[in-house]
Amino acid sequence: MGCCIGSFLNVVIHRLPQKQSLVLPSSHCPHCGEAIAFYDNIPVLSYVLLRGKCRQCRAAISARYPLVEAMAGLLALALFRRYGFEPQFFIEFVFVVMLLAIAFIDLDTFLIPDVLSLSGLVIGLLASFLSIRLTWVDSLMGILIGGGFLYLIAIGYQYLRHQDGLGGGDIKLLGMIGAFLGVPG
């Protein structure tokens, strides 16, 4: 399951910054544009069997695809071993795959999409009602302290240096992290 989610994360990582649909067209080779058959779209395994190349044009496929799939699979396995199919598994899995998508998008574009960080913030707050680790008050405090702390740093830097030193995406991301993790201590 985790590797399949990782496969979808690759779609998100590749298409979201380009403002492309996450649903259509179906998976295709980034080089020749040929649609990828379902049997060539099995997470990690297809990459290995095809030796990292497109079946149609033989162009190399980035190793990032199986890396993201494997990372999502390993994270799912680790969380499942800890929580089983309890609500906390799903809460924390959503959190880590959102972080994974954000990390790779940020690596490519130096941008953190609001659609991920803000929806993650809301999901984290709502998930706190089901969480065994924190209450909704902890989650709300995490949002305010996490995002608020970076916001104050950004304002202070801008006041002192008369230029932006921190992007708004970082502030929203820390708010999202605070929503899922609450306030330490």
Language-model-detected regions and their locations in the chain:
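Hydrophobic alpha-helical transmembrane segments
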Residues: 1-4, 76, 80-81, 125-132
